[in-house]
Amino acid sequence: MKLHRYSFLARLSALVAAVASCATVSTGYAAVSPSPDVHAVSWIVVDGESGSTLVEHDADVERQPASLTKLMTAYLVLDALKRGTVRWDEKVLVDAADIGTVHNDEARMYLVSGQRISVKELVQGLIAASANDAALVLAKRIGGSPDGFEQKMNAMAHQLGMNHTHYATPSGITTPGNYTTARDLSILALRLTKDFPEYYTFSSEQHFSYGAFQKRNKNWLLGKDPSVDGMKTGHTQAAGFCIVATAKRHQASPPMARRVFAVILGAPTANDRIAGAGSLLNYGFSAYSDYSVTDPSGSHTVTRNSRPGPA
């Protein structure tokens, strides 16, 4: 009888552990089980300063990222601008081969063969309008060819520690071998914004226009939540609805600003994507409490402590 009772308790303990592992908060003190309202295949929330994971669900599942691929494209373009190998005001010639693979149902800014367009306008189209034609033109300018740019993308992913990511396109169109994870995208999001804070200038634009073309930024949190200032959305049939979102909010005690990043992959609808991102950002700001400490030398520090997760 004791043996059967022990076996039952062991199975019960294993079941409880498996359920708890579905969504956990990682802190320096303890793990708690939260209940953010998210409908998606995988997601993660990280602290913007330390990069610590606040909550996650299947964050290491490899998936097609759709236009979240453009975050790496943007990273490489901004890196080239920083290095001086390309200039913001440089006029890039659009070649027919660059845009010939962009279909009518893809996001684009309607570039035409033979025109010249500035790098700044291309970056605006890439980030705010998620334009695939802009991604391809920039990829050729930075990498020399699509293959050359993809090699740069994968080299940078390796350098940043994105160990479950492989790129096979600069635009994010469904392509075999193009995959990443929610965790890897959180790594990229932190590095992109820390290395190139000018990214916020483009990702916070609610509307994009180029000639007669106009498009609203699909990160609908912009304008609804004044603390949200980026970053990128994506959608394909294979990837579902995806988003990397970030917000910066000020707290009263101690007076300081905090930033949180949220990543969602594989939401079933655009509304689920936005609602889930908002829920995760709100949870991220409630997951930690900050308080100030003055050590014996008089130095002022801020200590981060965990709060219980929501019931």
List the model feature ranges, each with a label.
Residues 13-24:
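Bacterial N-terminal signal peptides
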Residues 21, 34-36, 253:
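Sterically constrained small-residue positions within well-ordered secondary structures
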Residues 25-28, 302:
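N-terminal compositionally biased, intrinsically disordered segments and leader/signal-like regions
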Residues 28-183, 190-196:
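Active-site-adjacent loops and short helices of periplasmic peptidoglycan-processing enzymes
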Residues 162-166, 174-311:
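Domain-terminus/edge residues, biased toward the C-terminal soluble/receptor-binding domains
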